[in-house]
Amino acid sequence: MSSASTPTAPYLEDLVRNSLDQNLPWVVQKYGGTSVGKSLDNITKIVGSYIDNGSKVAIVCSARSTQTKSLGTTNLLLQASREALQPAMSSSGDGRSGSMSGTATPFYPKRVGSGFFGKDQSTSMTSSVSSLSQLESQLGRSGSPSPFQSSSSRSPPRSPATPSQDSSISQEPAFHATVDLIKKGHLEAARASLKGGPLRDELEEEIERDCESLRSFLYAAQIIDEISPRSQDSIVGTGERLACKIVAAALRDRGVDSELVVLDNIVDASMSAASEAVSVDAGDQGVAQLGQEFYDQLSFRLGERLRECGQRVPVVTGYFGPVPGSLLAQIGRGYTDLCAALCAVGLKASELQVWKEVDGIFTADPRKVPSARLVPIITPDEAAELTYYGSEVIHPFTMEQVIRARIPIRIKNVENPSGAGTVIYPDVGFPRGLDTEPPKAERIVEGVDERMPTAVTIKDEIIVLNIHSNRKTLSHGFLARIFGTLDRAGVVVDLISTSEVHVSMAMQDFLNRKRLERLVKDLEKIGEVTVSKDMAILSLVGRNMRNAIGSAGLMFASLARAMINIEMISQGASEINISCVIENKDAIKALNVIHESCLSYPRSPATEMAGLQLQ
């Protein structure tokens, strides 16, 4: 066991710890922002229960989110980065009680190097992005350390150049209020989650320090009027760091020995520069795409880093530092799930658990279809299709990392930890993370028709573009021009149906009016264009449909009986998904109709019992 931390509670010797037994399995648990924000007590109990039951636990956390997603920490951080590039607002006074004004020097509480977060200083709390040094250099302060650096190796940083405090008019940037809101929310969470004492005091100081470091970073960005993609990554990573500090402290406060693991510098220059780890294909956006070897190297390093925690429970930031081409550009907002997946691969975990606020994957959205049932087992292909067509399961690329390692993924409810959840199993023909074979689906749900689809989902806010060409051009040239136009506009097509001179495409309606008009104008050079708005994609998904006869006929006949018009039909090459486009106003009706006709069990004693087992 590492000795970097000193006791912060009188019951330190009684803390629950991971075992040193190499034969015991690792379980990696990923908690979403809402779970961290609302169910911290449950998280600490869940971690303790898994350790008591003989597992070694590592947890990965997203940035906090409480009431609404728009007020989640990540969204607020992105808002602050946008505000940093706005002109400062003039004011005659500070206008914010207890907060740093635009003319004040940022406040940096003195860090106690031997405290609970002391380990973080020497291993993880180093510079999170080199671009800040470049910002400071442009400001003539190249000797100043990054405000994101560990305080163990520097004195409190000076604030970026600000207007003179003698000025009668202070400048208050727009991001001030946003940073204050982030700080206020995390301080309130710390006070609500921990009993008073040195540990809570230290946590509050850490929150103050991180938020004021963020403020200084935004000041510097405002002065040069630029935030690079890697700088934005660093700004966004503050959310995971704040959340994990609260979770790590809450675990310790409740008797679980934990260690904060900040991954700001897990990707070093050797990984970034390794030509074999980065694909030479720059892609359409001009950003080099990371190859699988990069993620293999990263998972290995993550496994090494987490094993260094010894018996402490690693509490891992989902943000894993600047990567070539920017984390947000390479991966997007789902980087926390990917981090958890790579941790599971690096630790050779028996299972990756994704804890949400729902019991698992259902046959349909239970908020829209009251008769929806929990699906106990699902294949990776089915989960990927459901995610792509409207159900928030887990990103397919994230899923691919653990499935390649034959590690199952279990989706569970943080409010109902005793529930079985839904398990995404790797193909059973290959070795997995566990030695035991996964239970057969027919054993769990006896009497269920094996040809039955798995789930039905809806994706709304869809538009359909129909392009017809009367020219006798070759079809490949016709399609090439269409997709070249869509590529230049940055449009991703969800469904497509083609003939030699006609193409129908369904896509999400994310374009504003001007961009859509520009796209239509460009496409009109190729052929006649019509646009249908307020549409939805209805998708029936199920691996068993590959060998079923009449699934499509049953689906479309059911919609016809319900007087629901079909605008477009598409079936994937994998044969596990049948999709059609309908009017958005019919979406909920269609969901219930298809669920009743295609996913309801025949009423017999055997299937009644199966239905009970699925509840």
UniProtKB/Swiss-Prot annotation:
Transmembrane segments: none
InterPro entries linked to this entry: AceGlu_kinase-like_sf, ACT-like_dom_sf, ACT_Aspartokinase, AK-Hom3, Asp/Glu/Uridylate_kinase, Asp_kinase, Aspartate_kinase_CS
Classification via Pfam families: AA_kinase, ACT_9
Pathway annotation: Amino-acid biosynthesis; L-methionine biosynthesis via de novo pathway; L-homoserine from L-aspartate: step 1/3; Amino-acid biosynthesis; L-threonine biosynthesis; L-threonine from L-aspartate: step 1/5
Keyword Membrane assigned: no
ACT domain: residues covered: 467-537
Known function: Phosphorylates aspartate, the first step in the biosynthesis of amino acids that derive from aspartate (the aspartate family of amino acids), including methioinine and threonine, the latter of which is a precursor to isoleucine.
Protein name: Aspartokinase
Organism of derivation: Cryptococcus neoformans var. grubii serotype A (strain H99 / ATCC 208821 / CBS 10515 / FGSC 9487) (Filobasidiella neoformans var. grubii)
Lineage of the organism: Eukaryota, Fungi, Dikarya, Basidiomycota, Agaricomycotina
